Regions:
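N-terminal start-of-chain detector that recognizes signal peptides
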Residues: 3, 50-53, 136-140
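Conserved aromatic-histidine-acidic binding/catalytic patches
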Residues: 18-25, 47-55, 169-176
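Serine-hydrolase catalytic core
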Residues: 103-195
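Primarily recognizes the serine-hydrolase "nucleophile elbow" in alpha/beta-hydrolase
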Residues: 36-101
Length: 195
């Protein structure tokens, strides 16, 4: 059958043997860059007090919110357009281990145009798995540390100087549910964040 497409899976292997840690290391990289810039020339020579504004769309907005969760005192403003604020639904597939369950449903992305008769499902290399007996198990603790929308964590975050938030999100967003962002904003306001 000339129209047949073989369904197969490929994992991306980064050149430095890294893995998709989904947010934590990227947020730490951003924060380390902010701390370095604030402590070194030419910004230090300017008398300090330079505002730190993080902005992003989708995953970039997620990283901005995650930076504010990790080090709220270091960020003055968050400008977020359509980020996700929790690992809702099957978004765990982006961490890479969804392929263990069913690579045709829980993949990072796919390509069905590169080859005529091959449908490629693609995932990142991952450190994590869904085996509860493994030291690499993606536990609830490892999940919630990556979620800006966690009320317990937001309560702790509210005890520190924290950023002002400007958040945009379409009610028609099919990738990241508007209701999640609405809940995030509600909790931020409840805890007296400036939104």
């Amino acid at each position: 059958n000339q129209n047949y497409k073989l369904r197969t899976h490929v994992s991306f292997l980064p050149s430095k043997n890294e893995y998709q840690n989904f947010g934590i290391m990227q947020a730490m990289d951003i924060l380390n860059a902010i701390f370095y810039i604030k402590e070194n020339s030419p910004f230090k020579l300017m008398g300090g007090g330079i505002r730190t504004i993080l902005f992003g769309n989708s995953y970039g907005g997620y990283l901005a919110n995650l930076c504010a969760k990790i080090a709220p005192w270091s960020i003055d403003f968050i400008l977020d357009n359509s980020s996700f604020v929790n690992l809702f639904g099957n978004i765990f597939r982006l961490i890479g281990f969804g392929k263990e369950i069913d690579f045709t449903r829980y993949h990072g992305t796919y390509d069905d145009t590169l080859f005529k008769n091959i449908f490629l499902y693609l995932s990142d290399k991952t450190y994590w798995n869904n085996n509860k007996f493994s030291k690499k198990y993606f536990s609830n603790a490892r999940k919630i540390i990556r979620e800006p929308l966690n009320k317990e964590h937001l309560i702790i975050q509210s005890l520190y100087p924290n950023p002002k938030y400007i958040l945009y999100h379409s009610i028609f967003d099919e990738r990241s549910p508007f209701e999640n962002k609405e809940n995030f904003v509600h909790i931020l306001k409840e805890l007296n964040f400036k939104v």
